[in-house]
Design a protein with these regions (language model features):
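Alpha-helical transmembrane segments of multi-pass inner-membrane proteins
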Residues: 137, 154-180, 185, 195-272
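Juxtamembrane membrane-water interface segments that cap and precede transmembrane helices
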Residues: 46-51, 115-118, 191-206
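Membrane-embedded alpha-helical segments of multi-pass membrane proteins
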Residues: 5-17, 42, 56-75, 129-137, ...
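N-terminal hydrophobic segments of proteins, predominantly signal-anchor/transmembrane helices
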Residues: 30-51, 61-133
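Interfacial loop-to-transmembrane-helix boundary motif in multi-pass membrane proteins
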Residues: 32-37, 83-97, 130-133, 141-175
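Structural signal for the C-terminal ends of transmembrane alpha-helices
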Residues: 16-27, 42-45, 69-82, 141-151, ...
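Alpha-helical transmembrane segments and terminal signal-anchor/GPI-anchor hydrophobic tails
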Residues: 277-282
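Membrane-embedded, hydrophobic transmembrane alpha-helices
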Residues: 1-57
Length: 282
């Protein structure tokens, strides 16, 4: 596989500046959403700036850390990390410290005929613990800025808008094969043969695998369904058209799993109240 080009690393470096401007111009809810979602959709996959000791800076860690910095430095806001409930604190600490258990139980080396794989050391767990904490940052920030009806609607709007915008490169790749990441970032991020389906291709765009694109499209489709359910009568024709279009895009993804989830989850969104939805999600 070819290596990422200069544009890929340049994107990693400029994304914090882009996010800083979004946090200056948008309300905190939308700024947070597009910092995380935008980075997920357009930043290069499998590309990282490797620094000693600290976690790799990639399309996950850079948006998450940038959002935290913008919230605390630009907005001068205080972000509560640990929940008030003891059970919540225990679960978060267990998630963050789990890499230590992995290291302690994988200290033996593996010996093969041609090579040897060294056992894990305590040093290996340091970056892993930091990575676990970074993964949780969007949840802490989301609790602060998205825990309102307006914040929830902003998430739905962003998912639908992102799905519609992403459909353009998806359609290009479905027709001409997954090439966007090669054209922009200089490499293909997975096994090309896994993109060949049903006489055509599954789009990958800037995500790591075609399944990731399919599940993102599913999320956009479910968000569109929720918006259609709550839309006023005058806005329903447009909302229905977007829903049908995103359903077509899910078919373009040529993945059976997301279709099964769609059939399973759609009735919950349409016919069931929020209390039951939360219980099912739990």
């Amino acid at each position: 596989m070819a290596s990422p080009n200069v544009i890929a690393y340049l994107m990693l470096l400029i994304w914090p500046a882009v996010c800083w401007q979004m946090w200056k111009r948008l309300d905190p809810a939308r700024a947070l959403i597009w910092t995380i979602l935008g980075g997920y959709l357009i930043m290069p996959p499998m590309t990282a700036i490797n620094l000693p000791i600290v976690p790799d800076l990639d399309k996950v860690s850079i948006p998450n850390l940038t959002a935290l910095i913008c919230a605390t430095w630009l907005l001068k806001d205080k972000i509560t990390i640990l929940p008030s409930a003891p059970v919540g604190k225990a679960l978060i600490l267990l998630f963050i410290l789990a890499p230590f258990a992995t290291v302690l139980t994988n200290g033996d080396a593996l010996y093969f005929e041609m090579r040897t794989i060294q056992g894990m050391k305590i040093y290996d767990s340091v970056a892993s613990v930091a990575n676990q904490a970074i993964v949780l940052l969007p949840f802490f920030l989301g609790r602060r800025y998205l825990g309102t009806p307006e914040g929830t609607r902003a998430v739905l709007v962003a998912l639908v808008a992102g799905g519609v915008a992403y459909s353009v490169p998806m359609l290009i790749e479905a027709r001409f094969s997954p090439q966007m990441n090669i054209w922009v970032y200089g490499f293909f991020q997975h096994d090309f043969f896994q993109t060949i389906r049903q006489g055509g291709f599954r789009p990958v765009v800037f995500l790591q695998h075609g399944l990731w694109v399919a599940f993102f499209t599913l999320m956009a489709l479910l968000a569109a369904l929720a918006m259609l359910r709550d839309a006023p009568a005058a806005a329903r024709p447009r909302a229905a058209a977007i829903l049908i279009y995103l359903f077509y895009m899910l078919l373009v993804c040529k993945s059976a799993g997301p279709l099964v989830y769609l059939v399973s989850l759609s009735p919950l969104l349409v016919f069931v109240g929020s209390r039951v939805q939360i219980l099912v999600a739990a």
